[in-house]
Amino acid sequence: EPRSCYRTSEEQHVIAVRLAWGLDAAGIQPGDVVANMMPPGNLWVPFISYLGAVEHLDVRVLPIGRAYSAEAALKWMNRYKVNVLLGYPAEIVRVVLEAPAGSTFPQIRLIATSGTPVYEGPKRLLQEAFGNPRLVSAGYASNDTGPMGYQCEHCTTGAFHLQDDLQILEILEIDSDQPVPKGKPGRMLFTQLLLRVVPVIRYAIGDIGKWVDEDRCPCGRRSPRFELCGRTDDMLVGEALQLLPETLDA
């Protein structure tokens, strides 16, 4: 049985504001027209969470969700001159693949995604369809912890600034509770500093990451940066070594 997470309205408000900070850092600008294509309903949180987030930005919002045909989605995007897409990669790709022949695609400036990485094939498909938009992360977050990280324009794929006023991040050795040095991958544990109704303390998110071993980010933000390296269940563990996906040459 899944466990329930409860939040007060004040906690949800702070989470929405922090998500908005992340979207602003990722490149959403005042005056943008944002299509919220996150999945609504079925106890899914992202649609509501990001709808609350964009309300704190000076943008217009089109709440498309995913209960639509590709033809209808493109119709509304073109009618309201959408220039930013916010959603799961698979849902945005589905619109492209299921669009009727001869469909007109809007010129999109920015695609902010969440949930899963955008691999090279889908990335090329989206850039060809929507006029070479910039693809960014909408933020590193989970239903349990809320926002954990955000990307600025200087973050490479998989790298994030820590939401350090909301989270304490520990990166520990794979097989012990010892902290790893900067640049070495380890297990990521988060302690949420906001939630009081259902506290989240040293939560093992299941991701492997490493601290970015560089000086202060060129964007000027002082929050520490980390980079995702994979999942703990993606590791190959042997008697004398442990291999992460990033260490394997395809």
Cite the ranges covered by each PLM segment.
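Short, solvent-exposed loop/edge-beta patches enriched in aromatic
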Residues: 1, 27-30
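AMP-binding/adenylate-forming
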Residues: 10-24, 33-93
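Phosphate-coordination loops involved in phosphoryl transfer and adenosine-cofactor binding
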Residues: 30-31, 108
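Conserved adenylation A10 loop of the ANL superfamily
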Residues: 1-8
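Alpha-helix N-cap/helix-start motif
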Residues: 5, 46-47, 181, 198
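Active-site glycine/GP-rich loop and adjacent strand/helix microenvironment
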Residues: 60-250
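Structural motif corresponding to the C-terminal cap of alpha-helices
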Residues: 23, 27, 96-99
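Beta-strand-connecting loops/turns
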Residues: 31-32, 183
